């Protein structure tokens, strides 16, 4: 028999998956809470018990999705080379991700790119800072405040993801990965 907490987690997961499918199908700006509830097979009050509004669902969905991508691209070592390899692989995966690209072309993206750090960005900064601290101890990453370094790494990678399409005629996917690798290695040395 399932516990209520397992059922609740499953319902939350269904809601987030429904939100993701709505974003891919309609774009972030046209997603409604009613459509998310319909696709998840739950009532609107069920959704409201977990999230106060559609924007909160979008934030949770993005954080969950990015965490999933990070789990799919493992870190193969504690040094700068392994970390840069993972960052480049994650950036490549996110550039080709329908959900992320749908979000990038929305009003929501403008908020998280120009006005404030979102939860997923903060999680990435904290995770990167922890990994950079380990790499600093081994001497493969230069000294400095790990959170500041992590924030700059996030800005470099985020800019690459956002701008990849507009420079595709100059930097195809492989060349972009090579140049991002050089940029990150140069910054972190």
Curated annotation (Swiss-Prot):
Highest taxon above the source species: Bacteria
Family annotation (InterPro entries): DNA-bd_HTH_TetR-type_CS, Homeodomain-like_sf, HTH-type_TetR-like_transc_reg, HTH_TetR, Tet_transcr_reg_TetR-rel_C_sf
Protein name: Uncharacterized HTH-type transcriptional regulator Rv2250c
MF-aspect GO terms: DNA-binding transcription factor activity; transcription cis-regulatory region binding
GO annotation terms (biological process): regulation of DNA-templated transcription
Residue ranges: DNA binding: 32-51
Keywords: DNA-binding, Transcription, Transcription regulation
HTH tetR-type domain sequence ranges: 9-69
Keyword Cell wall biogenesis/degradation tagged: no
């Amino acid at each position: 028999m399932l516990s209520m907490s397992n059922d609740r987690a499953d319902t939350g997961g269904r809601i987030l998956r429904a939100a993701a499918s709505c974003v891919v199908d309609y774009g972030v700006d046209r997603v409604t809470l009613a459509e998310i509830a319909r696709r998840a097979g739950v009532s609107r009050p069920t959704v409201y018990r977990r999230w106060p509004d559609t924007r909160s669902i979008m934030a949770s969905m993005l954080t969950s999705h990015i965490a999933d991508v990070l789990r799919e691209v493992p870190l193969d070592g504690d040094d700068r080379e392994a970390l840069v390899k993972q960052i480049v692989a994650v950036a490549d995966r996110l550039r080709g991700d329908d959900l992320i690209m749908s979000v990038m072309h929305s009003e929501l993206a403008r908020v998280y790119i120009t006005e404030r750090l979102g939860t997923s960005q903060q999680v990435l900064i904290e995770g990167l800072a922890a990994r950079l601290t380990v790499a600093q101890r081994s001497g493969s990453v230069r000294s400095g405040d790990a959170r500041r370094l992590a924030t700059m790494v996030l800005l470099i990678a985020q800019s690459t993801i956002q701008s990849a399409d507009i420079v595709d005629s100059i930097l195809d996917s492989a060349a972009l990965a090579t140049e991002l690798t050089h940029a990150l290695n140069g910054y972190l040395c």
